[in-house]
């Protein structure tokens, strides 16, 4: 049994509140246990300079944390005048993951910005951001589709992310909270599509190694968790949008 009473293969309680903000084309509040992230999607009718005139779209992401999202206050990055390496890495990860399931040609010459703002952190902020940002992005694209239907719906598949790890006394586990993540011998983030394809695997031994058997166990746990997350996404988005993603 884990510190919060979960079994090794159990996600934390997932709660998604759609249309959490009134202004963005798509938005959700996603809660993964005590980790809470607001994800919003904004549509711009322009693309980055390097893509102008190509007729293709772009997906980009920004990530930030409230100063007191953690147990001690952090200085706002805007006050420092620069984005930290960690933030830059996570922003690129979110954007890269979302672009993997979007047909940028079908999107047309527009940019969708995903803003992921962590209001409370208890481990897994980047994976929660990806899972929530996907829902917000699809909501925004669905609104465009309602205005002028796409010949081909730009979203090709579902996408979700979770964490897995190896604990000294608990073995392989799914969806680590902060206490578990801090003590983990191995920490891995897994991003997958609804069809079971991998988008990214980020795994690291923390002063430890892991075996091929443990790797297989971690991947199996991740696949189980992501499958459950995608079912939640489908429930939030509804049958009509789910059918559009499936090409029906």
UniProtKB/Swiss-Prot annotation:
Binding sites annotated in the UniProt record for phosphate: 86, 124-126
Catalytic activities: tRNA(n+1) + phosphate = tRNA(n) + a ribonucleoside 5'-diphosphate
Pfam family, one: RNase_PH
E.C. code: 2.7.7.56
Keywords tagged on the record: Nucleotidyltransferase, RNA-binding, rRNA processing, Transferase, tRNA processing, tRNA-binding
Record GO terms (molecular function): 3'-5'-RNA exonuclease activity; tRNA binding; tRNA nucleotidyltransferase activity
Biological process per Gene Ontology, one example term: tRNA processing
Primary enzyme class: transferase
Signal peptide: none
Top-rank taxon, per record: Bacteria
Family: Belongs to the RNase PH family.
Task of the protein: Phosphorolytic 3'-5' exoribonuclease that plays an important role in tRNA 3'-end maturation. Removes nucleotide residues following the 3'-CCA terminus of tRNAs; can also add nucleotides to the ends of RNA molecules by using nucleoside diphosphates as substrates, but this may not be physiologically important. Probably plays a role in initiation of 16S rRNA degradation (leading to ribosome degradation) during starvation.
HAMAP family given in the database record: RNase_PH (MF_00564)
Subunit structure: Homohexameric ring arranged as a trimer of dimers.
Protein name listed in UniProt: Ribonuclease PH
Organism: Listeria welshimeri serovar 6b (strain ATCC 35897 / DSM 20650 / CCUG 15529 / CIP 8149 / NCTC 11857 / SLCC 5334 / V8)
């Amino acid at each position: 049994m884990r510190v919060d009473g979960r079994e090794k293969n159990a996600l934390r309680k997932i709660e998604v509140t759609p249309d959490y903000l009134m202004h963005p084309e798509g938005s959700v509040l996603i809660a993964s246990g005590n980790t809470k992230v607001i994800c919003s999607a904004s549509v711009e009718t322009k693309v980055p300079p390097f893509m102008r005139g190509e007729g293709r779209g772009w997906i980009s992401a920004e990530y930030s944390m409230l100063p007191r999202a953690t147990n001690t206050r952090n200085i706002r990055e805007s006050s420092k005048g620069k984005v930290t390496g960690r933030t830059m890495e996570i922003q690129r990860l979110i954007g890269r993951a979302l672009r993997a399931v979007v047909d940028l040609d079908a999107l047309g010459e527009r940019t969708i910005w995903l803003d992921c703002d962590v209001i409370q952190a208890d481990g897994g902020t980047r994976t929660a951001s990806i899972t929530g940002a996907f829902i917000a992005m699809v909501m925004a694209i669905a609104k465009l589709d309602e205005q002028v239907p796409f010949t081909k719906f730009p979203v090709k598949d579902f996408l979700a992310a979770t964490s897995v790890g190896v604990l000294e006394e608990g073995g392989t586990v799914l969806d680590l909270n902060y206490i578990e993540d801090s003590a983990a011998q191995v920490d891995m983030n897994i991003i997958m599509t609804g069809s079971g394809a991998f988008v990214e695997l980020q795994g690291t031994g923390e002063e430890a190694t892991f075996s091929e058997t443990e790797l297989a166990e971690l991947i199996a746990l991740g696949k189980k968790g992501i499958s459950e997350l995608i079912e939640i996404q489908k429930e939030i988005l509804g049958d009509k949008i789910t059918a559009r993603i499936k090409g029906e």
